[in-house]
């Protein structure tokens, strides 16, 4: 984490998590993911973060497009954020974020679950 790039990712990750905590503190658990996403966007804009929602991810096999998916959010074209309002973060959620990271050539992702009494945040790294 001594590299400048690593420090930038850590700083950005802390800002994202701080925004998530604020949204969870104000809304609490129990809403749909879309409500948290909309509130998150407001918080991120306050932090002057560049946020892209529902970015299309092209999945290729042998250089041929086989399908397109949409990820929840990407912040500063760097960190993929997958929002959940689920009982638990499951292995499949990690697999989905890792596949988005791989398809986009990114290294860092977060899964944020708002359904718990205390917000749940998991980091996902793809190298």
Kindly give the residue locations of the regions a language model identified.
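Solvent-exposed, charged helical/coil patches
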Residues: 1-48, 119, 125-127
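Conserved catalytic cores of phosphodiester-cleaving nucleases, focusing on short active-site segments
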Residues: 28, 51, 73-87, 100
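A short acidic/basic microdomain associated with nuclease active sites
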Residues: 47-63
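A structural signal for short, well-ordered beta-strand segments
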Residues: 55-57, 73, 121
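Short, solvent-exposed polar/charged micro-motifs at secondary-structure junctions
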Residues: 61-65, 120-122
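N-terminal, polar/charged subdomain of small-to-medium soluble alpha/beta proteins
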Residues: 68-70
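Nucleic-acid nuclease catalytic cores
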Residues: 84-127
């Amino acid at each position: 984490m001594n590299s400048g790039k690593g420090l930038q990712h850590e700083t950005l990750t802390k800002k994202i998590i701080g925004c998530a905590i604020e949204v969870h503190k104000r809304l609490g658990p129990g809403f749909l993911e879309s409500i948290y996403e909309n509130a998150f966007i407001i918080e991120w804009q306050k932090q002057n973060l560049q946020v892209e929602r529902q970015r299309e991810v092209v999945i290729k096999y042998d250089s041929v497009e086989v399908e397109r998916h949409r990820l929840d959010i990407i912040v500063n074209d760097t960190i993929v954020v997958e929002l959940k309002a689920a009982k638990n973060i499951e292995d499949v959620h990690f697999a989905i974020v890792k596949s988005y990271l791989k398809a986009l050539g990114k290294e860092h992702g977060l899964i944020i679950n708002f359904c718990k009494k205390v917000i749940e945040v998991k980091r996902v790294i793809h190298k």
